[in-house]
């Protein structure tokens, strides 16, 4: 039976690969997409998500989400993804539009209609998820688990210690991590290992229309290079859903620093139990890289 999922995203070039996998992996049933400000503004992430859905002729409802973090000024990652968020490919015009409700209410309504608890996947800042949990706490019982791309048990990529998705809205992340829902965290500890090799990247233009499109986007992606390999951060959250055997997880207490002058946005991952607090997150710490690369090749071959 296919696993029903809702995907919260901020496309973003590596988001595009994750969305492809969520749509075409035969094990998954992508029922709702929502957008959030992150890599670029929410207007741009929404436009990009709609372009991708149209490209794949995917009839999946999409709702636009939060334009700004809960309390902070917005930041972005245009230096990594380009000013549009998905530079490099000319998508055809379409007349699709988002639902006439904000993302957190769209998630709430879809959860309440679902016949069974649903897995949420968040591969951008956690603003929409925090709004859902704070404004609609009755929804917790309908969430099977939350799988995120975000955080790190070690070094950051936005500050010395903070990963971008968490640092973009630390207060939202703190709310989510305190919520009591089951969380799987695919952070930089694994996503920095999730590299598509130059040899594989070179095959994409001949793979199918998706491969050609992604190859064009990748030429503008700055998380690695076409010559050294590209890191597929967001794709790890989708990969865990389908192939959890590729990941090594450890239950840990995780908190989000919101006050530090230099450490705001850091995920404090208590790997050794120093704080004597109960684990609230399953933290991915290692990845079978060869197995991941093989799975990516298999799922993108289906993305026609």
Swiss-Prot record:
The lineage of its organism: Bacteria, Pseudomonadati, Pseudomonadota, Gammaproteobacteria, Enterobacterales. This is Non-specific ribonucleoside hydrolase RihC. Belongs to the IUNH family. RihC subfamily. It comes from Escherichia coli (strain SMS-3-5 / SECEC). The gene is rihC. One of its GO terms (biological process) is pyrimidine nucleobase metabolic process. Pfam families: IU_nuc_hydro. Its EC number is 3.2.-.-. The active site is at 233. GO terms for cellular component: cytosol. NCBIfam families: PRK10768.1. Hydrolyzes both purine and pyrimidine ribonucleosides with a broad-substrate specificity. The keyword Hydrolase applies.
């Amino acid at each position: 039976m296919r696993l029903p999922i809702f995907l919260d995203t901020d496309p973003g070039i590596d988001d595009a690969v994750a969305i492809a996998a969520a749509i075409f992996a035969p094990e998954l049933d992508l029922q709702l997409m929502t957008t959030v400000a992150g890599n670029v503004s929410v207007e741009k992430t929404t436009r990009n998500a709609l372009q991708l859905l149209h490209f794949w002729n995917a009839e999946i409802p999409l709702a636009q989400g939060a334009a700004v973090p809960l309390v902070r000024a917005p930041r972005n990652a245009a230096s990594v993804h380009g000013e549009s968020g998905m530079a490099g490919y000319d998508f055809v015009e379409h007349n699709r539009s988002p639902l006439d409700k904000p993302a957190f209410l769209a998630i709430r309504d879809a959860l309440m209609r679902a016949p069974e608890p649903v897995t949420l996947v968040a591969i951008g800042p956690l603003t929409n998820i925090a709004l859902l949990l704070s404004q609609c706490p009755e929804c917790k019982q309908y969430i099977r688990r939350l799988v995120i791309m975000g955080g790190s048990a070690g070094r950051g990529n936005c500050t010395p210690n903070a990963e971008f998705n968490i640092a973009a809205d630390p207060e939202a992340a703190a709310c989510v991590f305190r919520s009591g829902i089951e969380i799987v965290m695919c952070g930089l500890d694994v996503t920095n290992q999730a590299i598509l090799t130059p040899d594989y990247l070179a095959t994409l233009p001949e793979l199918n229309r998706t491969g050609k499109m992604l190859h064009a986007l990748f030429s503008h992606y700055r998380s690695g290079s076409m010559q050294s390999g590209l890191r597929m951060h967001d794709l790890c959250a989708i990969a865990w859903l389908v192939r959890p055997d590729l990941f090594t997880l450890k239950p840990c207490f995780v908190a989000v620093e919101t006050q530090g002058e230099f450490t705001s946005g850091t995920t404090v991952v208590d790997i050794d139990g120093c704080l004597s607090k109960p684990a609230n997150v399953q933290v991915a710490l290692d990845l079978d890289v060869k197995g991941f690369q093989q799975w990516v090749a298999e799922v993108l071959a289906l993305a026609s």
